[in-house]
Structures are given as structure tokens and as C-alpha cells.
């Protein structure tokens, strides 16, 4: 037996001749594992977020088999285990409420079991960041395998995109331009296979960031969920994680500031989701990396969007895969990236794009013909968002990026839904819609309701965008001139709480400014009179979340989870 094998963490579980070693091995053998798999080889955990209630991840047990084949081939011992699964399209009030709970689940499962390395199988929006947050707090060798996008949606002979076309079709029904029967008929054609949204929503955004940060093998981001090459990728990931254990290539060696900056740049280039901001901040907090909101402006603000995929463009992720995938995107923007940043492959990230080619210049645009110049997520500050807010220029209307208008305020999401279709709602296309009470504490969980519907009376006149401001998030598949993540949120006593209908607001996304045009004296008087809303949650996880969640500009993690505790071998259990 080599010294390497003696040093493996798993030997504290399976290597002894004492009572506890007997217990650990004996009960594992009831699954049919033979003696020799406990000979000191690396034990690889496959952390699986499979669930039938998470349609995006419904095929992950199949991909897990691919990972296992690779682990066995490389001389390891794979063990699959479940963790919480967050179905974005199914959970209420919002999957984001449970991202931190998933992170706790992942962290404690990895630490508590006798494993030497871990493969994270995720996909649906919050599963990838939740798994990475948990894994970063333990710091074993770690690789991500994403579930991959669904096949392109098809309806009436054309491609339709998940999420993005839902919002468009819904507004068309409200405007009387689409029948309810047509709306329902499009439903089955939109989701034709397992996988995540095939638009550049949060799931593929996070998969793209993961690949750009060197946390997965190349091509992980865009290969369709049902493409045989994703199964092969899973197999190769299984082989590689065993090698990483022998190399002691831990997650902390990959989660560098340079790789976070590469992730920010990639997010801008693909027209990625605003949700990436809050997730990357949370992962950085676990990894001990000094990442702040201003870094997204500094690093990504001037990066062009060159991926012509919905919601910013017209194609879908299956098209991106066939056009060359993320390696081809990185090849085009390589002058902006840190080429020597480390990867799970043990090579510099530049090797990921070295041989990549672009096969469709309309899907992956040349730098001299971008979809949108200076398209990175912009950070806004001002007296309405002292700690920051974000906007996605690539999905906004250019003429609204600098806009001043009167506010119309909705105090809650219920208030909005009760009034938005009122034919007498006193708004014009210059009005700025403001929604309160939808931040981390307020909703709770900072739901994806920031892309408020356009008032029906304006939709019927052909208006399809207007400035909207909230402390909420929005789906990565959504679009519009939408200011999000206003911090501090209304329920935490941020200035958003004291905005009144009729107040004038000025947005200047190019200058990074968001201001309430009310005198300092009036603002101070309103704030002095403000009372926090009554606390609704008196027990359980909701109370824990409300009492300890950080604001959006800090990643909305729970305050006591920031940082790491490591992979210490814990006390024996018997």
C-alpha cells in the first residue's frame, strides 16, 4: 500500500481494524461491494440534486452512472448520495429561499462522510451555486458536472425559448394579440427533453461561469442534456476527480480571484443573468475571496456581449453548443481573460480555448460586431440604493438606460397583482414602476418578481418595456429595463421603503446612478417615521433565514455560514 493511499481521508472510515472500521465497511458491503474496494483507493462522492420535482435535473441519475464508470476506470470507488434539490419552476415562495439550506446540506454531507473528493451534479438555477457554496466551505477536490440545457423548444415551425417566450406570450395574451388556446398549445413544445432552460437563463449562466472559472471540464456549459457527449463528459469527469485526489488539487486552489474575474467576464460575454452577481458573491464569501459588487463594474462593465442567445439575442443554447460552445466564446475574448488561471484539469484555463473554433458567426459574434458593446451587468448606486443595485444592459431598451420619471409604487407583490390590470391605473410609459417588500427578508428569499408585468392599459397600446425598480431578482430568461437587488432592501429599512407614488426617480445606467429626487430633509423625515413590518416568521428555517440573511450586495448568504470549516475528520460515531 502506497503512502498516498495511507494519507487519504477515507482511511479514517474504512482503513482500520477497530470496531468503527468494521461497522463502516460491513454496512457498505450490504450493497454488494467486495472487500477489495476498501483497499485504500480514493472514495469519490457524487453529490446529486436529482429529483422528479426538479425537472431540470431529472436525468442526473443517468449522468451519475457516467461519472461512476470514470471513477471505477481510474481506480477509485464511487458513492452517490442525495442532497436537497431546488426546482426553480416548482418551489414556492422561491427556490432562492432554500439555496443556503442546500449549501448547508452539501457542506455537512461532504464533511460527515468518508470521501476524498466530490463531483457536484447540479443544473437548475440555485443548485449549482448552493452546491459550490457548501463544497467551498469543506474544500476537498471538487468538479462540477452540469445537467445541460433542454433541446430547443419548437412550436409552429419555429424555435421558442424557455422563460423568455413565456414572458412574451403572456404579454401577447394580455394585449389580445394571442389567443389563450395558442398560449396553451405552445406549452408542450417549449420543454421537449430533460435539462435546464435552453435560453441564457441563470442555470446556463452559472454553468458558463463554472466552465470559465475552470471548475468543470471544457464544453460543460452548453452541450444539451440528452447529447451523448454529456454522458462522455461525465465519464471523463469521473476519471479526472480520482487524479485530483492523488494530486491534492482542492477547490481552494481553483477558486482564485483571477478565476472569479474570468467568471465575471464570461458572464458579460454570454449575456448572462443578473442572478450570477448574488451567487458569485456568496461563493466568494465561502472561499474567502475578496469579491465585491464594484468588481462586476470594474471587470465586466465594458465587456461586449457576443453570444446571440435569448433573452438578449435570438438563438438558443443548443445553437451555442453547435457553434463552438463556451471554449469558442472564450477564444474570442481571450485578450480579456486571465490565461494562466488554474483549472480542475490541472492546466491553465487558456488550454480550454486553445483549439476552439467558432462555427457560426451569428451565434457567437465577432468582436467587431457584438450583440451589444459594454454589455456587462452594471452596478448602480445613489440615494435610492446606497449599497448598490444591478441592471442588465444587454436585455434592456437602450433608450431607457438613462431615464427620469414619476414613481408608481406597489407595496407588495399582492398589491401589484391586484392593480396591474386596472384600466384606470394612473401610469404612462414614462412612469417608473417600484415594487417593495421582495428582498431577502421581505418576500422572503428575494423572489424572481422584479420583471413586473407592463400595466395592461399600456400593453394594449403597444408598450413592451418601461423602467422597473425593486429589491427582488428576476429570472435570467427575462428581459427589460429592470433595476434589481436594491440594497438595503425595503424590509431592512433601505430608502426603497420610503418611496412614494409621484416621487421622481432618475436612472442613469451608463453613469451607474440611481437617485430619488427628493430633498434630504424630506428623506430624513420619512425615514424617521418608518416602521419595520411585523415579523411573520416565528419558528423553523424561515425564522432562521429572516434573522440571519445578508443583503444582496453581500450575496444573501446566512451570516454564520460565511467562510469555511474545512474537511477535518470528525469524532467516531460509535
Swiss-Prot record:
Signal peptide: none annotated. Binds 1 [4Fe-4S] cluster. The keyword Iron applies. Its EC number is 4.2.1.-. Keywords: Iron, Iron-sulfur, Lyase, Metal-binding. GO terms for molecular function: hydro-lyase activity; iron-sulfur cluster binding; metal ion binding. GO terms for biological process: carboxylic acid metabolic process. Disruption phenotype: Cells lacking this gene exhibit no detectable phenotype when grown on galactose as sole carbon source. [4Fe-4S] cluster binds at residues 124, 197. It holds the Pfam family ILVD_EDD_N. The keyword Iron applies. Its cofactor is [4Fe-4S] cluster. Involved in the degradation of galactose via the DeLey-Doudoroff pathway. PANTHER family: HYPOTHETICAL DIHYDROXY-ACID DEHYDRATASE (EUROFUNG)-RELATED, HYPOTHETICAL DIHYDROXYACID DEHYDRATASE (EUROFUNG)-RELATED. Belongs to the IlvD/Edd family. This is Putative dehydratase IlvD1.
Amino acid at each position: 500500500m502506497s503512502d498516498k493511499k495511507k494519507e487519504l481521508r477515507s482511511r479514517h472510515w474504512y482503513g482500520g481494524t477497530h470496531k468503527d472500521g468494521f461497522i463502516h465497511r460491513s454496512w457498505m458491503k450490504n450493497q454488494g461491494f467486495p472487500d477489495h474496494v476498501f483497499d485504500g483507493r480514493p472514495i469519490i462522492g457524487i453529490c446529486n440534486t436529482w429529483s422528479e420535482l426538479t425537472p431540470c435535473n431529472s436525468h442526473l441519475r443517468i449522468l451519475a452512472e457516467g461519472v461512476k464508470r470514470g471513477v471505477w476506470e481510474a481506480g477509485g470507488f464511487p458513492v452517490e448520495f442525495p442532497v436537497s434539490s431546488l426546482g426553480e419552476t416548482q418551489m414556492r415562495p422561491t427556490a432562492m429561499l432554500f439555496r443556503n439550506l442546500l449549501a448547508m446540506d452539501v457542506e455537512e454531507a461532504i464533511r460527515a462522510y468518508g470521501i476524498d473528493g466530490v463531483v457536484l451534479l447540479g443544473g437548475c438555477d440555485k443548485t449549482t451555486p448552493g452546491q459550490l457554496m457548501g463544497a467551498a466551505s469543506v474544500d476537498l477536490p471538487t468538479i462540477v458536472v452540469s445537467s445541460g440545457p433542454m433541446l430547443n423548444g419548437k412550436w409552429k415551425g419555429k424555435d421558442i425559448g424557455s422563460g423568455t417566450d413565456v414572458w412574451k406570450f403572456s404579454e401577447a395574451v394580455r394585449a389580445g394579440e394571442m389567443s389563450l388556446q395558442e398560449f396553451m398549445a405552445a406549452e408542450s413544445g417549449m420543454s421537449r427533453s430533460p435539462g435546464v432552460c435552453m435560453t441564457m437563463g441563470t442555470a446556463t449562466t452559472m454553468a458558463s461561469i463554472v466552465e470559465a472559472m475552470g471548475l468543470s471540464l471544457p464544453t460543460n456549459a452548453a452541450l444539451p442534456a440528452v447529447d451523448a457527449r454529456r454522458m462522455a463528459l461525465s465519464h471523463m469527469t469521473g476519471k479526472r476527480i480520482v487524479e485530483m485526489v492523488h494530486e491534492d488539487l482542492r477547490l481552494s486552489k481553483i477558486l482564485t480571484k483571477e478565476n472569479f474575474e474570468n467568471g465575471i467576464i464570461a458572464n458579460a460575454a454570454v449575456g448572462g443573468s443578473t442572478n450570477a452577481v448574488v451567487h458569485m458573491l456568496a461563493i466568494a464569501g465561502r472561499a474567502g475571496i475578496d469579491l465585491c459588487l464594484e468588481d462586476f463594474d470594474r471587470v465586466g462593465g465594458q465587456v461586449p456581449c457576443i453570444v446571440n442567445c435569448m433573452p438578449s439575442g435570438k438563438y438558443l443554447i443548443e445553437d451555442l453548443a453547435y457553434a463552438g460552445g463556451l471554449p469558442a466564446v472564450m477564444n474570442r475574448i481571450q485578450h480579456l481573460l486571465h490565461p494562466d488561471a488554474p483549472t480542475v484539469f490541472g492546466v491553465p484555463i487558456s488550454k480550454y480555448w486553445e483549439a476552439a473554433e467558432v462555427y457560426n458567426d451569428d451565434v457567437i459574434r465577432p468582436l467587431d460586431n457584438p450583440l451589444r458593446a459594454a454589455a456587462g451587468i452594471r452596478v448602480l448606486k445613489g440615494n435610492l440604493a446606497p449599497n448598490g443595485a444591478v441592471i442588465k444592459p444587454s436585455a434592456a431598451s437602450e433608450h431607457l438606460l438613462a431615464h427620469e420619471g414619476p414613481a408608481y409604487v406597489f407595496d407588495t407583490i399582492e398589491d401589484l397583482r391586484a392593480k396591474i390590470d386596472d384600466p384606470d391605473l394612473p401610469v404612462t410609459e414614462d412612469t417608473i414602476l417600484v415594487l417593495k417588500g421582495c428582498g431577502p427578508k421581505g418576500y422572503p428569499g428575494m423572489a424572481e418578481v422584479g420583471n413586473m408585468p407592463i400595466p395592461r392599459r399600456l400593453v394594449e397600446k403597444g408598450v413592451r418595456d418601461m423602467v422597473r425598480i425593486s429589491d427582488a431578482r428576476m429570472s435570467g430568461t427575462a428581459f427589460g429595463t429592470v433595476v434589481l437587488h436594491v440594497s438595503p432592501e425595503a424590509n431592512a429599512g433601505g430608502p426603497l421603503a420610503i418611496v412614494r407614488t409621484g416621487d421622481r426617480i432618475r436612472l442613469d445606467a451608463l453613469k451607474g446612478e440611481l437617485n430619488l429626487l427628493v430633498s434630504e430633509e424630506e428623506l430624513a423625515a420619512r425615514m424617521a417615521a418608518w416602521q419595520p413590518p411585523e415579523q411573520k416568521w416565528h419558528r423553523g428555517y424561515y425564522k432562521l433565514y429572516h434573522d440571519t440573511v445578508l443583503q444582496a450586495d453581500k450575496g444573501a448568504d446566512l451570516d454564520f455560514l460565511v467562510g469555511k470549516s474545512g474537511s477535518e475528520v470528525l469524532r467516531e460515531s460509535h
